[in-house]
UniProtKB/Swiss-Prot annotation:
InterPro entries: Alpha/beta_knot_MTases, tRNA_m1G_MeTrfase_C_sf, tRNA_m1G_MeTrfase_TrmD, tRNA_m1G_MTases_N, tRNA_MeTrfase_TRMD/TRM10. The gene is trmD. GO terms for molecular function: tRNA (guanine(37)-N1)-methyltransferase activity. GO terms for cellular component: cytosol. GO terms for biological process: tRNA N1-guanine methylation. It catalyses: guanosine(37) in tRNA + S-adenosyl-L-methionine = N(1)-methylguanosine(37) in tRNA + S-adenosyl-L-homocysteine + H(+). HAMAP family: TrmD. Pfam families: tRNA_m1G_MT. This is tRNA (guanine-N(1)-)-methyltransferase. It is found in: Cytoplasm. Specifically methylates guanosine-37 in various tRNAs. S-adenosyl-L-methionine binds at residues 112, 131-136.
Length: 250
């Protein structure tokens, strides 16, 4: 995969070399390049922003340096791939979006600053992505989150290919509780089933606990989840347990 990033602060992406992304680069699974689009300004002051027409607070990123930087990337690579604009008004980023992006050969991220963008920049964009209902100073942190979540899904990036498939959200549910040695720590014991060596029972326990955790913490994820008969039975059990606790408090 090739990832291009347009940013006014390329040094902010240094930490990526210390992470899973860095390992992907070392393995030649990923080629990542950061371009400072200030280098493509045509004014003497090297300004990349200007006041908005019609008045208003703040400054807007100009279209010209972004367009010229994108043209340069396209000339070098033959294409831009999917061009992603980090924007609070964009599509909310989640695991399904990461999985979608991980199937692409080329991604280009535009990281903005200031009050916003000249609207004409959006004409070059294929995807607008938001991390949530909040505003960051710039798009760099958002881009790093999207890149990390996407790159770890590429084949052979993680040491164990099952690591990504077993993550929270990958199966539509939160991840089940996990334990390591010792089996008893300050009176807190590892569930006996995990010590049994019975892989079928362990798999069933994990599935049930994954569903339980999702039911308790992120019930919204279950709205589009397709339940098996066994899972429906577990849900009824969770409901009964919930009712008992509520009435017990009363």
């Amino acid at each position: 995969m090739k990832i291009d990033i347009l940013s006014l602060f390329p040094e902010m992406f240094g930490p990526l070399t210390e992470s899973i992304v860095g390992k992907a680069v070392e393995k030649d699974i990923l080629d990542i390049e950061v371009t400072n689009f200030r280098d493509f300004t045509t004014n003497k002051q090297n300004h990349v922003d200007d006041y908005p027409y019609g008045g208003g607070a703040g400054m807007l990123l100009q279209a010209q340096p972004i367009y010229d930087a994108l043209d340069n990337i396209e000339e070098k690579n033959g294409n831009l791939g999917r061009v992603i604009l980090l924007d609070p008004a964009g599509r909310k980023f989640d695991q399904s979006v990461a999985e979608e992006l991980s199937k692409e050969d080329h991604l280009t991220f535009i990281c903005g600053h200031y009050e916003g963008y000249d609207e004409r920049i959006r004409a070059k964009v294929t995807d607008e992505i938001s991390l949530g209902d909040f505003v960051l100073t710039g798009g760099e942190l958002g881009a790093m989150v999207v890149i990390d979540a996407t790159v770890r899904l590429l084949p052979d990036v993680l040491g164990n290919n099952e690591s990504a498939s077993g993550d929270s959200f990958s199966m539509g549910l939160l991840e089940y509780p996990q334990y390591t040695r010792p089996s008893n720590f300050r009176g807190m014991e590892v569930p006996e089933v995990l010590l049994s060596g019975n892989h079928q029972k362990i798999a069933e326990w994990r599935k049930k606990e994954s569903l339980r955790r999702t039911y308790q913490r992120r019930p919204d994820l279950l709205e589009e989840y397709e339940f098996s008969d066994k899972e429906k039975e577990w849900l009824r059990e969770f409901e009964r347990d919930k009712d008992v606790k509520i009435h017990g408090k009363g």
